[in-house]
Amino acid sequence: SYLVRTVQTMNETYFEQLEETLYHEELSNGLNVYILPKKGFSKTFVTFTTKYGSIDRTFVPIGEQETITVPDGIAHFLEHKMFEKEEGDVFQKFSEVGAQANAFTSFTRTAYLFSATDHLYTSTKTLLDFVQQPYFTEETVNKEKGIIGQEITMYDDLPDWRLYFGAIENMYHNHPVKIDIAGTIESIEGITA
């Protein structure tokens, strides 16, 4: 099969304690690919993870000289927006081939993922395409501000969430980890297409 031919050319690391072999290759574009075959499993999980999370608020864009600062919550906002394309919702494309898609943002990463038992090539291509080809308009960005604003309000009503971020804020006075991953209603208002 294609997977067997692929892993035969990759670097492999065997973890004796887990009795697992992890295959790795760094592509010419810098993308790291990891494959962890699981005997006896029917479902395949695929993730596309970027090293861009909620604490990554300042950076120098490729080809630029100056540092820019983006609004708090931008990584989470992008996570939401990437699933929306001009031709429709990317979730529908995954559903059409029996795959389930999702995403999450942490302090240091954003991950886009799907699980499926069939049509892995089609779903992987969909994942790679939608993550690398964003689609934004002022209208869709403004609509998303409302959706994420509701999400922020919902989490503000959860006692465990408030306790967690209260503790983080008290421990890290000057570090961006103290700010909710989704940002604030005020910060997401500063996001434009």
Report each predicted region and the residues it spans:
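His/Glu-rich zincin catalytic helix
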Residues: 2-90, 187
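Acidic/histidine-enriched segments that form metal/cofactor-coordinating
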Residues: 2-5, 9, 86-193
